[in-house]
Amino acid sequence: MDYTRAGARLQVLLGHLGRPSALQIVAHPVSGPASPANFCPEQFQYTLDNNVLSLEQRKFYEENGFLVIKNLVSDDDIQRFRAEFERICRKEVKPPGMTVMKDVAIAKQGYAPSERVVTKIQDFQQNEELFRYCALPQIVKYVECFTGPNIMAMHTMLINKPPDSGKKTSRHPLHQDLHFFPFRPSNLIVCAWTAMEHIDRNNGCLVVLPGTHKGPLKPHDYPKWEGGVNKMYHGIQDYDPDSPRVHLVMEKGDTVFFHPLLIHGSGRNRTQGFRKAISCHYGSSDCKYISVKGTSQENIAREVIEIAEKRYGVQGALDFEDTWKFRCRLVKGERINL
């Protein structure tokens, strides 16, 4: 299969070059109600037949593109994920392939290694402790409602939104996750995003634009923010600023599942604490890779390839598809295409 060939090719390259430690990168809300789940579609488009979601939950996701499940992840699991994150921040753990990101405003201040300087870790699929999140049975049973039984963990994050420095760099611009993904169909992709503590507008909760998952993928680029923008924080260049928005106030353990075309972002953290959340983007292994050449995704493809080539010390040996094939990991079922 392609993923075997690509993985083997990269493994050979890395075998000669050795694997470096995790790369470190310097990295106007209007509230509105979600649409009521009172419609009867002729055919469900965004959810699969199952006995997990109630009819009302299924209708809500179909109409709005997201669904919050309360108290899904235990306090004990969240504490374990927090402890492992702190070990990574202290550089006691260096899983292969993981990216450690710093806030663009904080990175210049020269703090010692700690959670104070790390704003996010990405691609922790090879860290067995954090990967437990991706495989939690209570998470996976909901994921299967969107992806079907063959489930891949495609992209993982533990987000540590820092107190804003005053430059508003702790914001995450409104975006669609599909901008970052070279695989389709989008309806077989879902994100699980779990609050690791109480999250509200004060510390930068998620904000979503209900129903936008029904629209197209929009062009993304870096927003022109005066205080600077974190690495790979692309945002939508064209959206209706008057669109209704919902701010997701969540308690520790609450989990939101959302579609990759749903427009969402987060505000700045106005508190003195660090706002933590853990997430995984899942895709059905029946999805297929696509070429993004000539599309609005070319800009992120160039950026990801550049980072991967720098990490692995290779030039011209990778394409966008390779970077995903090497990172993703099977969660359940059979690995078919991805």
UniProtKB/Swiss-Prot annotation:
Indicate the principal place this protein occupies in or around the cell. other
Which enzyme type, at the first EC level? oxidoreductase
What keyword terms does UniProt attach to this protein? Dioxygenase, Iron, Metal-binding, Oxidoreductase, Peroxisome, Transit peptide, Vitamin C
Give the required cofactors: Fe cation; L-ascorbate; ATP; Mg(2+)
Enzyme Commission numbers on file: 1.14.11.18
Q: Where does Fe cation bind?
A: 175, 177, 264
Q: According to its UniProt record, which reaction does this protein catalyse?
A: phytanoyl-CoA + 2-oxoglutarate + O2 = 2-hydroxyphytanoyl-CoA + succinate + CO2; 3-methylhexadecanoyl-CoA + 2-oxoglutarate + O2 = 2-hydroxy-3-methylhexadecanoyl-CoA + succinate + CO2; hexadecanoyl-CoA + 2-oxoglutarate + O2 = 2-hydroxyhexadecanoyl-CoA + succinate + CO2; octanoyl-CoA + 2-oxoglutarate + O2 = 2-hydroxyoctanoyl-CoA + succinate + CO2
Q: Which domain of life is it from?
A: Eukaryota
Report the subcellular localization: Peroxisome
Q: What's known about how pH impacts activity here?
A: Optimum pH is 7.5.
The terms describing its cellular component in GO are: 9+0 non-motile cilium; peroxisome
N6-succinyllysine is carried by which residues?
59, 108, 231, 252
Q: What does this protein do?
A: Catalyzes the 2-hydroxylation of racemic phytanoyl-CoA and the isomers of 3-methylhexadecanoyl-CoA. Shows activity also towards a variety of other mono-branched 3-methylacyl-CoA esters (with a chain length of at least seven carbon atoms) and straight-chain acyl-CoA esters (with a chain length longer than four carbon atoms). Does not hydroxylate long and very long straight chain acyl-CoAs or 2-methyl-and 4-methyl-branched acyl-CoAs.
Assembly: Interacts specifically with FKBP52 and PHYHIP.
Query: Which protein family is named in the record?
Result: Belongs to the PhyH family.
Protein name (Swiss-Prot/TrEMBL): Phytanoyl-CoA dioxygenase, peroxisomal
